[in-house]
Every structure is written in C-alpha cells, then in structure tokens.
UniProtKB/Swiss-Prot annotation:
Keywords: ATP-binding, Cytoplasm, Ligase, Nucleotide-binding, Purine biosynthesis. It is found in: Cytoplasm. Transmembrane segments: none annotated. Belongs to the AIR synthase family. It comes from the Archaea. One of its GO terms (cellular component) is cytosol. One of its GO terms (molecular function) is ATP binding. This is Phosphoribosylformylglycinamidine cyclo-ligase. Gene3D superfamilies: PurM-like C-terminal domain, PurM-like, N-terminal domain. It catalyses: 2-formamido-N(1)-(5-O-phospho-beta-D-ribosyl)acetamidine + ATP = 5-amino-1-(5-phospho-beta-D-ribosyl)imidazole + ADP + phosphate + H(+). It comes from Methanosarcina acetivorans (strain ATCC 35395 / DSM 2834 / JCM 12185 / C2A).
Length: 333
C-alpha cells in the first residue's frame, strides 16, 4: 500500500480547474431573451428556470459520466439509462419542479449486439419511475471521437412560480432530513476506477462484503430517482432541497450560505467503506467527492420533518446552523 492518500484530482478530475472552465464559459453567455421564456434566474442552480406565465419551465442537462466505462467492461448496459434520467430528474426536483419530458443524446464508437435494447430498457424504466415521457433524442456514431459510448440527456419540468425552491426560505434551526442513496450513484467514477485499478481487484470479482454479487454489479447499481419528494412538497412546508452529486456535500452551497450540521448522518453503504480502504482516501475527500450514503436532502421546519422522513424512507440527520458544513466532528467547509 502506498502512503499517499488518493484524491479525485489524482485520478484526473480537478474540481477547482473544472469550476474555472465553467465560469469562463458562462461569462461568454451574455444574451438574455425577453418576454415569454425569459430566464427567471441566473446560471448555476440545479435547473434553469424560464418564465411561462403562472408557471416556470425548468430545464436540466446531465449525463452518466465515466460510469459507462464500467458498463462496457461488464457488457451490462440496462441500468445506465436509469442513471441518465435520474441525474436530470433529481436536479429538477431540487428546485421543486415536476418532470414532464426528456430527450436523450447517445454518442457511440460502434454498434454492438444487444446494446441499444439495454439502453432503451433503462431509459424506459427511468421514465416510468419519473412519470414523464421521452419525446425525442439523438444518436450519433462517432468512431473518431468516442471510445465506447457516452449517454446524456435534457429534462423539462414545470413548477408554479410561488412554489420554486431556491434556498431563500432556509432558516437557522430548520431540520435536515436525508434520504438514502443506492450507492455511488453517477458521480466520482473516475476516482472509483482509479481505486479499483490500484487495488488489484477486477469488476468481475465478488464483492469482499457480499459474494452474491460482483464489484461491477455493485458499482452499476442505478441512481435512485427521488420522485417521492413531490409527495413531500404537497404534504409539508419545505424550505429547501438538495441533490447530493458531484463535489459531495459541497453541493449544498447551491442552496444556502448558512451552515449544515449533520449530527446523525446516514451510514455510508459498504461500497464506500471498501473504496475508501482500498484507495486510502481520507474522510474529507470522500465527503467532498461522493454522496456517502445520502443522495438527497430536504430542509424543513421541525414540525414537518418527521412526516417528510416517513414519506421518503429518510431520517432526520441534523439542522441548519449559522455557518460551515460539518459531519459530526469532520469539518467539510
């Protein structure tokens, strides 16, 4: 074992440089439409919001990322369509919008027997869970550009203007209700693959903690779609929502500048413990890269917290404080 602790940057993904690239791109996007369809917010939240009378249209775009490389290695593609839809739908839910339509973009190196049917199977399952239609898409064969394949999509949602959740309602003392993830979901896979490479394991090896499935099977567990959050929005007073994806708990800064104190966090699944041990990854790096067992967070007044937890299978994990992000004694920010 090396004494060096593996980081996301070591695996090839430097979040700081990525943020600078995104900012440079956004700075060039100065044109703003007026009238119907005009943006209601700036770029940078979970979804873009467009004026549509009494309602706002919400739009997200996202992809599966390098998780598709594990799907290729396993020759198992029937779950990545769920991931593609989940990454978009969960971002819509995080601003209070209901998903209504989806289009996908599939770029591939070559056509392989059984591939398209399995991709379609996953997309269909994700759409059914999300209660929305897939209304189109694009497939491109790009052997000079793509090695393997890439899968992404764009999702459209609707929300009444008065029901938009951008974080402005969050107050000190609000209760945090976390909803469990199904595992790694669809972020941090460049680091995951680096860890597996370093460990000497293969994706076809049995999980050390569950021999009934392989490491590859565990890593291909599809991202949970948190559609039940819509039930919470109808039944409870919700002040804020967060989809915990890339950058881990640092993603909470999209919601509020106030602090998050996780005094009773959700226990990370065994896959995170395995990855941390094999990669010798420090606690801080884990929480700044992965969801660590909690894929979605709801922020509510105390009176509604228990109800929200009941509706989603979640649990009360902490509260809003003045500043910082802390998981027990671990300072994230």
């Amino acid at each position: 074992m090396s004494e060096k602790h593996l980081t996301y940057a070591d695996s090839g993904v430097d979040i700081t440089k990525e943020e600078k690239t995104v900012k440079t791109l956004i700075d060039k996007l100065s044109y703003v439409r007026k009238g119907i369809g005009a943006p209601l917010t700036g770029i940078g939240h979970y979804a873009g919001l467009l004026d549509f009378g009494e309602y706002a249209l919400a739009m997200t775009t996202d992809g599966v990322g390098s998780k598709v490389l594990i799907a290729n290695e396993m020759k198992r593609w029937n779950t990545v369509g769920i991931d593609c839809i989940a990454m978009n739908v969960n971002d819509l839910l995080a601003i209070g919008a209901e998903p209504v339509a989806f289009v996908d973009y599939l770029a591939l190196e070559k056509h392989e027997e059984g591939f398209a049917a399995q991709i379609g199977e996953g997309l269909l399952k994700g759409a059914e869970i999300s209660r929305m239609s897939i209304v189109g898409g694009e497939t491109a064969t790009l052997p000079d550009i793509i090695k393997g394949f890439d899968l992404a999509g764009t999702c459209l949602g609707v929300v009444k203007k008065e029901d938009i959740l951008e974080g402005g309602k969050v107050r000190v003392g609000d209760v945090l209700v976390g909803i469990p993830s199904t595992g790694v979901h669809s972020n941090g896979y460049t680091l995951v693959r680096k860890i597996i490479e370093k460990s000497g394991y293969s994706y076809h090896d049995p999980c050390p903690y569950d021999s009934s499935k392989t490491i590859g099977d565990e890593l291909l567990e599809p991202t949970r779609i948190y559609i039940e959050v819509l039930d919470v929005l109808k039944a409870c007073e919700v002040h804020g929502l967060a989809h915990i994806t890339g950058s881990g708990l640092l993603k909470l800064r999209r919601v509020t500048k106030l602090g998050f104190e996780f005094s009773d966090p959700i226990e990370p699944q065994e896959i995170f413990k395995f990855l941390q041990k094999e990669g010798e990854v420090e606690d801080l790096e884990m929480y700044r890269t992965f969801n660590m067992g909690m894929g979605f967070l709801m922020i509510l007044p105390e009176k509604d917290a228990a109800k929200a937890a009941e509706l989603t299978g979640g649990k009360i994990v902490g509260k809003i404080v003045e500043s910082g992000i802390r998981v027990k004694d671990l300072i994230i920010e």
